[in-house]
Amino acid sequence: MSFLEELRSLARLYRQQFKTTFATMVQYRASLFIWMIGQVLEPLVYLIVWSTVSNGNGGSVGGYTAQGFAAYYLTLMIVNQVTYTWIMYEYEYRIRQGSLSFALLKPVHPIHSDISDNLSSKLVTLPILLVVAGLLALVFHPVAAPTVWAVLAFIPALVLAFLVRFLMEWTLALASFWTTRVSAINQVYFILMLFLSGQLVPLSLFPHWLQVLGAILPFRWMVGFPVELVLGRLTPLQALAGLAAQAAWLVISLVLVRLVWRLGVRVYSAVGA
């Protein structure tokens, strides 16, 4: 099969996956509504808490006013939605139930099905979340100072953030090849993500050593960096360094996915799955 034929095959897969995902979400509207509430409530709670702290601290905390926190968490809501994955919850079930065996029989790598499913769901949910964020903006009056170059740089930063987060979490999900109880691994990962990605609080409010740790690990580059970038809180040099860090983690993620997948499939096949 030529490269162009492979691309056409993948395009058909992604198109069909979108139709399937859209039909499923329409059918299960109540579940979608509950999930969307969860996506909105978490950053909204952080926004209310830090806005209150800011107002009680002379109007500013670490350079963030109440309106600055509003801009941060409303943008975070969107960025987190774009980069969010749920694959770590699914792989344990797939392996325990044997459904992965069917995926291995297909000529296309299973990761493509997961990517297309993830993107398809976001095409459905993101417009809803944008409307909600717009309504919340009318209440909390966010203030930011983005520049043209920052907005333009935000686009590749967001794409890289999604790719790094998806590949990293897909790699961690493959731990299910060696243990069918990965909930502890997931919990440790999500705690680190909460603190070091900027979801709980902007990383600039942390002590210096935690900021350094956040810069070394991949979590900031999955969520916090695009938020800081589009809000105009980074210099051009910091933005370039951040994009370089994202590119480096993308390469690392691709290597890890290929390596761990190859090793995991061997283990899976060896036990007669």
Predicted features along the sequence, with ranges:
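Hydrophobic transmembrane alpha-helices and immediately adjacent juxtamembrane helices
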Residues: 1-273
